[in-house]
Structure formats: structure tokens, C-alpha cells
UniProtKB/Swiss-Prot annotation:
GO terms for cellular component: cytoplasm. Its EC number is 6.1.1.19. This is Arginine--tRNA ligase. InterPro entries: aa-tRNA-synth_I_CS (IPR001412), Arg-tRNA-ligase (IPR001278), Arg-tRNA-synth_N (IPR005148), Arg-tRNA-synth_N_sf (IPR036695), ArgRS_core (IPR035684), DALR_anticod-bd (IPR008909), Rossmann-like_a/b/a_fold (IPR014729), tRNAsynth_Ia_anticodon-bd (IPR009080). Its main location: cytoplasm. Keywords: Aminoacyl-tRNA synthetase, ATP-binding, Cytoplasm, Ligase, Nucleotide-binding, Protein biosynthesis. PROSITE patterns: AA_TRNA_LIGASE_I. The lineage of its organism: Bacteria, Pseudomonadati, Pseudomonadota, Gammaproteobacteria, Enterobacterales. PANTHER family: ARGININE--TRNA LIGASE, CYTOPLASMIC, ARGINYL-TRNA SYNTHETASE.
Length: 577
């Protein structure tokens, strides 16, 4: 149940009845403070201005038409014309019952869409590094949320599997007589890449051979395609280990690398020329865009084919968007790519729209993100100043979590300890990232992310086990509990219930904006409200069975909400800490 949507509909109807236009926005929001009720309708200001009347006067007229019987216990006008809505305890109790009766906690499913989500995108012949973390885990949280809401999600791992470097790599592979690249560890392959590059820079004959190999690879020569495939396979096999460690849902089947779009590129260049969008300029094929200006204030030229006939990333991105609409039948396409690529994407998509490859009705959304920084505020590096490998980061997370967990659980079996350390360590790295607004840079800090206080994975995982501990202590008759009514009589019960019932609203925001930090903030809030409820509203020592069972049901919905919410983030819960 989406209470915000229900109230929006009711307030909108009342506004129209009071003389507002049919497209009026009620602007129903969750209230920031308890004294303002559970929800506020803030839309009177804008509409009253259009109608030439005072907002408070409009609010008074709206109230005469607003029927919230059975939903709100009190509705009042505040300030210049805000409408504060206080939910009826009986309504909250009924909604809690309905949520508990559903595996989905009463979350409805919107109209099903086909949504393509582009995320992770590592490069072939290179090991994943910390720069891939944000795209991979933020994108995966979006995918999990969209799938939970019932959408058909197509994961698109836009792997860097094409380019001139492959001639160099194949030539070096051949020179070293290492055609069995599929048996090499990726760490070796990365060293192999460095050696190949060094040789390419220093040996002109080798470089010439590498350039010839690129031509042969691009012309589809069987031998060179086979060598290229080996390099791709070993890379993706190793990357899959990282995805599995991160509890990310990407698989080999989701790879849609740059090479996929190669056959489309000549046709796209020819079509853009035929449509008068692309022209020859200094030997290259260029699209001049009025929407983007160069330093002189003239339309910016975007090259789609170099004078030597080679294509650019922009050409591939145009083909990519076209493919996702025409072949994958996307209703919406989300790109989890860092903010530095924004202008590049906007230029490609402007060309896509002008060419008519993707209609305006299909959103192409750049869900950009900032950088991961060290404590010094600079890009996160090793002590030696090198790039941090993602596998090394996860190893350290596991080691730190192992020490932390062993300290708190000296009697835990080695097997159990390892499972718990994995959930806490990997969860801590992911949650530290997901809990920050993706558009900003954030400081990577081991001490903060592994703390048991504050908005961290260990705190959230502990909060979940704390709720479960109530049920371990209680001698519960499952059947009696299922049929027991929910009674909301205390303020803290009402506050917890109202927040729990905002789960669907939170999911809706995350799905619309691609902002998992909103889910993190919501779950942290729920954990805090449960803590206050637990301290002030005795559960197991309640005054009678009816109150005890009702409070157990609130605890039950809290546990289910925390577990399901953390699952949409890809954070593992544990039964004991």
C-alpha cells in the first residue's frame, strides 16, 4: 500500500472540487516532524497563486471537500496553507495486518516496463579496481529494486572488449607462445598487459605487427577472433568471482560488450550522413550540435568517424541506445556511469534523438555518481599511489571483519565466524557506498564503515538480529499470533507503524531516482524507531496477551521490512552477531 499515493489522490480530488485545475499537484509529502502529522499537502501555494486567492483560503475550501474518514484521525491547516494529515490508529493497525499477510509486505506492482540497466562495465585484460565498485553496486541495487517492483529488467554489462589494444595483446600472446591464455590468472594477464604495452612502445616492428593484427581482428579472421575470445573469457571468469563475492546479480549472460555494436557502426554513419546530421570536416565525419558550444561559441563538433575510418566511443554509444530500443524493446534505459562522462553521453543521446533512433517517450537516464576518496580527500589509492584492486579491497574488508567478529564472539565456530565475517565485511563496504547520495564524492573510511553505531551495515545487521532475539526469547504460538489483532494505542507504536508502512513509498523513490541512499536512510530510521518502541513499549512483559501479540506483530513487520529492504540493496542479513 502506498499511503502517499492514496492521500495524493484524495487531496487532488478535493482541490479540483474546490476549483483547482484538473492537473493540480497536491504535493503530499511525508512530514518532517511529528507535530506536523504523518503527511503534509503543500500544493495550495502554487495553485492558490494561479487562482488569485490566498493559500489558506484555498486550503479551507479544500478541507470542506476532503473525505479522509477511516484514514485520518485529524486534518488541520498550518501556517500559510499547509494541510497536515494525522493517520488514524485503526487505519495503521489494519494496514500492518495486510502487510504481514503478504510476502511482498503489501507492496503493489506498477505497470510492468522493460528497463535496461547499464552498469559495472569493466575492461578486458584488466583486473577490476575500486573505480568499478560504485557503478557495480549502485546499479545492482537499482536492478534488485526494479525487479522486486515487478519490472522486466535487462542487465547490460557494457564491457570494454574492443579496440586497438587487442592487436597488441594478441601479438604479445603469440610472441610468448601463450595461446592458452584461458588458463592464466587475471593478475598474470594484467602484468601481461603491461609487458605488451611496454614492448609496443619500444619495438616498432612489434607495434607494426600489432596494428596489422587489429585490422585482421576487425575483419573477422577466425584465428584472431579465437585469440580475442580467450582474452575476454579469462577476464569475465575472474570478474564473476568478484561479482559473486560482492553478492551482485550480474552473470556472464549479461555481458553486452562494445564489440556487440560493431556491425551497426558503418550503417549508423551512413544514415546520419543521409539525414543531413553528419558532414565531412577535415577528413573526419562530424555531427555539429547547436545544443553544445565550443570555446568560440560555435556549435560543437562531435566526431563519429575518424579520417582513418576508425569509430569512436560516441558512435558506439549511439548504436548502443538504438539497439536497446529497437532490439531489446526498452521502455526506459538507465546508465550507471560516473559523472565525468555526462557531456559525452548527452552529446550521443542528442544525436540519437535527432536521428529518431529512440523516441522522446523512452527516457535515457544518466544516473551519475561521484568518486570514492581516501581520508586525504584525494582519489582512493594504495600507499604506493597505485590503483586499488577490488579483490584486494574485499580481502581487507574480510580480514578486518573477521577480527571484529572474533572479538565479539570468541566461542563461535570457525565456519560460522567465516560466514558472519563475510556478511559483515562485504556488507560494510557496500553499505558505506550505498548510504551516500550517489551524486557526491565520499570518503572511504574503514573505521566508520565497520562501526556498530550510526548508519552502517554492522549496525543495520545487528538491528535485525535484535528484533529476531525478541522471538527467540518468546514462547510463541504462531497460529494465535497470526490471528491476533494489531492494536495501536501508544505514540511510539503509531510512529513505528506509520514508518513501516512507508516501505512502498521508499521503493518507489529508489526506482524512480536510482538513489539507494534513500532506502538506507529509511531502514536506519526504522531501526531507530524500533529501538525507541522496544524501550518504551514492553513486548514480552506487556500488560496482557492482546498487547503482547500486537507488539510482537509490529516487531515481526520490522524484521521483515529490514530484511527485505537490505535485500534490495544486496546486503546480507544474519541471524546472530
Amino acid at each position: 500500500m502506498n499511503i502517499q499515493a492514496l492521500l495524493s489522490e484524495k487531496v487532488s480530488q478535493a482541490m479540483i472540487a474546490a476549483g483547482a485545475p484538473a492537473d493540480c499537484e497536491p504535493q503530499v509529502r511525508q512530514s518532517a516532524k511529528v507535530q506536523f502529522g504523518d503527511y503534509q499537502a503543500n500544493g495550495m501555494m502554487a495553485v492558490a497563486k494561479k487562482l488569485g486567492m490566498a493559500p489558506r483560503q484555498l486550503a479551507e475550501q479544500v478541507l470542506t471537500h476532503l473525505d479522509l474518514s477511516g484514514i485520518a484521525s485529524k486534518v488541520e491547516i498550518a501556517g500559510p496553507g499547509f494541510i497536515n494529515i494525522f493517520l488514524e490508529p485503526a487505519f495503521l493497525a489494519e494496514q500492518v495486518q495486510q502487510a504481514l499477510a503478504s510476502d511482498r509486505l503489501g507492496v503493489s506492482q506498477p505497470t510492468r516496463q522493460t528497463i535496461v540497466v547499464d552498469y559495472s562495465a569493466p575492461n578486458v585484460a584488466k583486473e577490476m579496481h575500486v573505480g568499478h565498485l560504485r557503478s557495480t553496486i549502485i546499479g545492482d541495487a537499482a536492478v534488485r529494486t526494479l525487479e522486486f517492483l515487478g519490472h522486466h529488467v535487462i542487465r547490460a554489462n557494457h564491457v570494454g572488449d574492443w579496440g586497438t589494444q587487442f592487436g597488441m595483446l594478441i601479438a604479445w600472446l603469440e610472441k610468448q607462445q601463450q595461446e592458452n591464455a584461458g588458463d592464466m590468472a587475471l593478475a598474470d594477464l594484467e602484468g601481461f598487459y603491461r609487458d605488451a604495452k611496454k614492448h609496443y612502445d619500444e619495438d616498432e616492428a612489434f607495434a607494426e605487427r600489432a596494428r596489422n593484427y587489429v585490422v585482421k581482428l576487425q575483419s573477422g579472421d577466425t584465428y584472431f577472433r579465437e585469440m580475442w575470445r580467450k582474452l575476454v573469457d579469462i577476464t569475465m571468469t575472474q570478474n564473476q568471482i568478484t561479482y559473486d563475492r560482492l553478492n551482485v546479480t550480474l552473470t556472464r549472460d549479461d555481458v553486452m560488450g562494445e564489440s556487440l555494436y560493431n556491425p551497426m557502426l558503418p550503417g549508423i554513419v551512413a544514415d546520419l550522413k543521409a539525414k543531413g546530421l553528419a558532414v565531412e570536416s577535415e577528413g573526419a565525419t562530424v555531427v555539429f550540435l547547436d545544443e553544445f558550444k565550443n570555446k568560440e561559441g560555435d556549435p560543437m563538433g562531435v566526431i563519429i568517424q575518424k579520417k582513418d575510418g576508425g569509430y569512436l566511443y560516441t558512435t558506439t554509444d549511439i548504436a548502443c541506445a538504438k539497439y536497446r530500443y529497437e532490439t531489446l524493446h526498452a521502455d526506459r534505459v538507465l546508465y550507471y556511469i560516473d559523472s565525468r562522462q555526462h557531456q559525452h553521453l548527452m552529446q550521443a543521446w542528442t544525436i540519437v534523438r535527432k536521428a529518431g533512433y529512440v523516441p522522446d517517450s523512452v527516457p535515457l537516464e544518466h544516473h551519475m555518481f561521484g568518486m570514492m576518496l581516501g581520508k586525504d580527500g584525494k582519489p582512493f589509492k594504495t600507499r604506493a599511489g597505485g590503483t586499488v584492486k577490488l579483490a584486494d579491497l574485499l580481502d581487507e574488508a574480510l580480514e578486518r571483519a573477521r577480527r571484529l567478529v572474533a572479538e565479539k564472539n570468541p566461542d563461535m565456530s570457525a565456519d560460522e565466524l567465516e560466514k558472519l565475517a563475510n556478511a559483515v565485511g562485504i556488507g560494510a563496504v557496500k553499505y558505506a557506498d550505498l548510504s551516500k547520495n550517489r551524486t557526491t564524492d565520499y570518503i572511504f573510511d574503514w573505521d566508520n564503515m565497520l562501526a556498530f553505531e550510526g548508519n552502517t551495515a554492522p549496525y543495520m545487521q545487528y538491528a535485525y538480529t535484535r528484533v529476531l532475539s525478541v522471538f527467540r526469547k518468546a514462547d510463541i504460538d504462531e497460529q494465535a499470533l497470526a490471528s491476533a489483532p494489531v492494536i495501536i494505542s501508544e505514540d511510539r507504536e503509531a510512529q513505528l507503524a506509520a514508518r513501516l508502512l512507508q516501505f512502498e513509498e521508499t521503493l518507489t523513490v529508489v526506482a524512480r531516482e536510482g538513489t539507494p541512499h534513500v532506502m538506507c536512510a529509511y531502514l536506519y530510521d526504522v531501526a531507530g524507531l524500533f529501538s525507541g518502541f522496544y524501550e518504551h513499549c514492553p513486548i514480552l512483559s506487556a500488560e496482557n496477551d492482546a498487547v503482547r501479540n500486537s507488539r510482537l506483530k509490529l516487531a515481526q513487520l520490522t524484521a521483515k521490512t529490514l530484511k527485505l529492504g537490505l535485500d534490495t540493496l544486496g546486503i546480507e542479513t544474519v541471524e546472530r552477531m
